[in-house]
């Protein structure tokens, strides 16, 4: 256990140092934007393990007035042939990076663990597209599913949809669960970014430079929030007062993560208003560890735990 903990800290320190150095250089020239995405994908390939094989995978676009939104539909071997439960996933990456590809392992594990269809969303990213482009894309895909447009061709049961995401994706999932509380069956929030007003935890420590640090959060404020009111609940779902009748929530936080306190606070707020919550805190894990399942075995286990949660709160498949 001691060796594993040391390895975790060394790895997080290394990632943080590289991130800090790179953030100081980025001015968002087109070539640098491409480098951001390629570097993340390279890290994921190096430190993640391939997810389970699927029966079918379909890449297509969800039509929208502003932007045809790329999505990937995972259909696991144990999925029903009939329209069935579907989990919509919004990837993390600080609103400026991340993709369907970078989170392929996570979504495959959830699909296999549930036996449900999983729809992963490639929403627009800052700085090319600052707020509210990303949330608008995620909402458009959710509306498309809830209105039944994915049922006949893709087997998405409009009456049985859940949503979730990690980090930035968790931020958008939390807001959409609030807005569509009567329609969404469950929500999965992996180390979510819940507010944009104060990026420092109440008791900051050296662990808060690990993987996701204050500089990276400041970077999000400058290039994603970009002058918008950070008190809006679409940016800061933590500030929503009315949480009654929200769908059941699975909330994960990490000890080596400056977002840990706001994630825990949101879980407590949900519980206080009668929302069923399953809360997990991984004390020795850094932000983003689900993308590094080769390094952290819990990166393989947590998506399966979340899959168990989804099965508890979504309708069983037919047949």
Feature locations, PLM:
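A glycine/proline-hinged amphipathic helix-loop "lid/cap" segment
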Residues: 1-76, 315-319
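Short beta-strand element of the alpha/beta-hydrolase
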Residues: 83-92
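Short amphipathic alpha-helix adjacent to the substrate-entry channel of hydrolases
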Residues: 101-120
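Gly/Ser-rich "nucleophile elbow"/oxyanion-hole loop immediately N-terminal to the catalytic nucleophile
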Residues: 146-162
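Gly/Ala-rich beta-loop-alpha elbow adjacent to hydrolase catalytic centers
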Residues: 165, 169, 173
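Hydrolase active-site cap/lid region
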Residues: 178-228
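Short beta-strand/loop motif that positions the catalytic acidic residue
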Residues: 251-253
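Catalytic active-site module of serine/aspartate enzymes centered on a nucleophile-bearing elbow/loop
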Residues: 296-319
